[in-house]
Amino acid sequence: MLADKVKLSAKEILEKEFKTGVRGYKQEEVDKFLDMVIKDYETFNQEIEKLQQENLHLSKQLEEAVEQGKRQPAQSNTTNFDILKRLSNLEKHVFGSKLYD
């Protein structure tokens, strides 16, 4: 996924060799700069992996919450029905058949 978008890897940057010209860049300066770029790439890759794992974890949590939400109303309706039935039975017992005559 990410490999399709990124053109260079840390290893490719490390192994890249530049041709030297008559008045080329200082090789030491280029090497130091490339070392910094490599460290940044490695840091970014670690952060991306961490965020992908976190994203996967949160996606699973969301799926579980949605599934639980789908099941919850069915349990609630059954519970409400049971409570109403018990209340009706208690009223019959306490007040007798006077309410239902």
Curated annotation (Swiss-Prot):
One of its GO terms (biological process) is cell division. Residues 34-71 form a coiled coil. It is found in: Cytoplasm. GO terms for cellular component: cytoplasm. InterPro entries: Cell_cycle_GpsB, DivIVA_domain, DivIVA_fam. The keyword Heme does not apply. Keywords: Cell cycle, Cell division, Cell shape, Coiled coil, Cytoplasm. Its main location: cytoplasm. It holds the Pfam family DivIVA. NCBIfam families: DivI1A_domain (TIGR03544), PRK14127.1 (NF010725). Divisome component that associates with the complex late in its assembly, after the Z-ring is formed, and is dependent on DivIC and PBP2B for its recruitment to the divisome. Together with EzrA, is a key component of the system that regulates PBP1 localization during cell cycle progression. Its main role could be the removal of PBP1 from the cell pole after pole maturation is completed. Also contributes to the recruitment of PBP1 to the division complex. Not essential for septum formation. Belongs to the GpsB family. This is Cell cycle protein GpsB. It comes from Bacillus pumilus (strain SAFR-032). The gene is gpsB.
